[in-house]
C-alpha cells in the first residue's frame, strides 16, 4: 500500500479515487492535483512509480491543508467561536445544529438519542 500524507491508500483503486481517502481531498481536488502533476487519473495506485508518488505528496502538502493540519484548523475555528460566544459558538456548546436547521423535529444526529420526559399521571377516581 502506498502512503500519502500519513494515510494508506488502496493499491487496487484508480489514483483519482484513492486520493479521496485523504481527509481534505475530494473528487474535484483529486482531479485538479492529477492534472497539475500530469499523472493519468485512470492509472492504478500499484502502477505508480516512486517518482510519481513523491510528486503527488509534494504537490498536496505544498498547496493544500490536508489530514492533521486541516483537522486542527477546523477544531481551532470551533473553539474560537465557542470562546467569543457568537451564535454559532453557543450552538456548538449546546450540541445543537449550527447552521439554522429546524430542531422541533429532526436534528437527532446532533442532539443525540431521545430522552423521555415523565408526563402527568392519570388521576384515580
Curated annotation (Swiss-Prot):
Part of the 30S ribosomal subunit. Forms a loose heterodimer with protein S19. Forms two bridges to the 50S subunit in the 70S ribosome. One of its GO terms (molecular function) is structural constituent of ribosome. InterPro entries: Rbsml_uS13_C (IPR027437), Ribosomal_uS13 (IPR001892), Ribosomal_uS13-like_H2TH (IPR010979), Ribosomal_uS13_bac-type (IPR019980), Ribosomal_uS13_CS (IPR018269). HAMAP family: Ribosomal_uS13. It comes from the Bacteria. This is Small ribosomal subunit protein uS13. GO terms for cellular component: cytosol; small ribosomal subunit. Belongs to the universal ribosomal protein uS13 family. Keywords: Ribonucleoprotein, Ribosomal protein, RNA-binding, rRNA-binding, tRNA-binding. It comes from Bifidobacterium adolescentis (strain ATCC 15703 / DSM 20083 / NCTC 11814 / E194a). It holds the Pfam family Ribosomal_S13. GO terms for biological process: translation. Located at the top of the head of the 30S subunit, it contacts several helices of the 16S rRNA. In the 70S ribosome it contacts the 23S rRNA (bridge B1a) and protein L5 of the 50S subunit (bridge B1b), connecting the 2 subunits; these bridges are implicated in subunit movement. Contacts the tRNAs in the A and P-sites. Residues 90-125 are annotated as: Disordered.
Amino acid at each position: 500500500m502506498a502512503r500519502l500524507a500519513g494515510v494508506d491508500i488502496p493499491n487496487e483503486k484508480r489514483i483519482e479515487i484513492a486520493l479521496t481517502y485523504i481527509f481534505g481531498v475530494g473528487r474535484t481536488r483529486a482531479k485538479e492535483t492529477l492534472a497539475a502533476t500530469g499523472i493519468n487519473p485512470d492509472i492504478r495506485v500499484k502502477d505508480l512509480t516512486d517518482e510519481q508518488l513523491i510528486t503527488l505528496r509534494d504537490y498536496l502538502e505544498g498547496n493544500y491543508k490536508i489530514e492533521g493540519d486541516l483537522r486542527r484548523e477546523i477544531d481551532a475555528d470551533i473553539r474560537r467561536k465557542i470562546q467569543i460566544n457568537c451564535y454559532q459558538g453557543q450552538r456548538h456548546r449546546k450540541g445543537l445544529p449550527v447552521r439554522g436547521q429546524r430542531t422541533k423535529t429532526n436534528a437527532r444526529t446532533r442532539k443525540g438519542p431521545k430522552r423521555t420526559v415523565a408526563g402527568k399521571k392519570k388521576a384515580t377516581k
